From Swiss-Prot:
It comes from the Bacteria. One of its GO terms (molecular function) is heme binding. This is Cytochrome c biogenesis protein CcsA. PANTHER family: CYTOCHROME B_B6 PROTEIN-RELATED, HEME EXPORTER PROTEIN C. Required during biogenesis of c-type cytochromes (cytochrome c6 and cytochrome f) at the step of heme attachment. It comes from Trichodesmium erythraeum (strain IMS101). The keyword Hydrolase does not apply. Keywords: Cytochrome c-type biogenesis, Membrane, Thylakoid, Transmembrane, Transmembrane helix.
Length: 351
């Protein structure tokens, strides 16, 4: 079997499947009443994931080292990670809207690797001496998985911002679930655009109320008095989310938090492994190389995100903006440094 031809075929097939999957997800978002589109989207993403895994396996057999040593290999490894995390997120949330945002990114990365990179960068070459280490798999693979996880989590935060754009949304569910009940409030929308929340406590007061005697000026009969004041809040109809969109926003907020919570420890482990490897290879744990600096910036951004959510109880728009910032920082750390700068990680630089 010609492994080189197999790899070339698989990278083109992966791109084609991801492109078709992206269109399916977009059609599903435009026409949600067509039931089989969501199944086709998930199936397409799973097939693309399998094709990329086979491509990486063929490259491993051909080159005899784990395929994350150059930009082409790392791009497809990143795409495989994104499709894997996508499938996990979709299964956890039950929201097919996830694919509307993740499939274009996965397709774009595979297109860049398969169609844009020069052919000489797509072939396997012997490892440079600095990469002939067991730390290659440990450090680079964990870093790439953290990038994939953080990218998907940040994408879902961006999706939250898009869905709730220009609208005031207050989420009151727990950050640890995907379908939390907004504090058991019964919410009903009235025609005069008044939002009325009736809490279980009010119902309990009504049920358990015992009348007490009160004299009136007109007669001396004993009457029962219970005065209940219901407070309503007038809300501009333009800022009210429909119950369906509010539920989707809640799911996206929660699942984004959980995925970023998975990606952050992976990033931490990857940075620590890289520091140990750097000490073995270059005699220093930290040298403020551009890649190291941006990895630290990435870590700080997502550390701030998790700190705000865990200790400050942030939900909704504020942490989503932090995650969206992290999305840009991850790409600078991964591609920007390699494409636009030189340093100890210059083996990926080609511009």
């Amino acid at each position: 079997m010609d492994l080189v031809k197999l790899q070339k075929s698989l990278d083109n097939i992966s791109f084609g499947i991801l492109f078709a999957t992206m269109l399916i997800y977009w059609l599903g978002a435009a026409f949600p009443r067509i039931p089989y589109l969501s199944i086709l989207g998930s199936t397409g993403m799973a097939i693309a994931n399998l094709c990329i895994a086979t491509l990486l396996g063929a490259r491993w057999l051909e080159a005899s080292y784990f395929p994350i040593s150059n930009l082409y290999e790392s791009l497809f490894f990143l795409t495989w990670g994104i499709t894997t995390i996508h499938l996990i997120a979709e299964n956890m949330s039950g929201a097919r809207l996830v694919g509307v945002f993740t499939s274009p990114i996965a397709m774009g990365i595979s297109a860049f690797a398969a169609l844009t990179l020069p052919s000489n960068m797509q072939i396997s070459e012997p490892l440079v001496p600095a990469l002939k280490s067991n730390w290659l798999m440990m450090h680079v693979s964990v870093m790439m998985l953290s990038y994939a996880t953080l990218i998907v989590g940040a994408l879902l935060a961006i999706a939250f911002l898009i869905i709730t754009s220009g609208q005031k949304v207050e989420l009151s569910g727990s950050s640890f679930g995907t379908r939390s009940s907004r504090n058991n409030h019964f919410v009903k929308y009235q025609k005069n655009w008044q939002l009325q929340k009736e809490r279980p406590l009010l119902k309990e007061i009504k049920n358990n109320y015992k009348p007490f005697p009160q004299s009136t000026k007109n007669d001396h009969s004993q009457t029962s008095v219970l005065e209940i004041t219901e407070v309503t809040q007038k809300v501009d109809p333009e800022i009210i989310l429909s119950p369906e969109r509010l539920n989707i926003a809640q799911i996206l907020d929660n699942i984004s938090y959980r995925i970023i919570g998975l990606g952050f420890p992976l990033l931490t482990i990857g940075i620590i492994a890289g520091a140990v490897w750097a000490n073995e290879a270059w005699g220093s744990y930290w040298s403020w190389d551009p890649k190291e600096t941006w990895a630290l910036i990435t870590w700080l951004v997502f550390a701030a995100y998790l700190h705000a959510r865990i200790t400050k109880g942030w939900q909704g728009r504020k942490p989503a903006i932090l995650a969206a910032t992290g999305f840009a920082v991850v790409w600078v750390c991964y591609l920007g440094v390699n494409l636009l700068g030189k340093g100890l990680h210059s083996y990926g630089w080609f511009l």
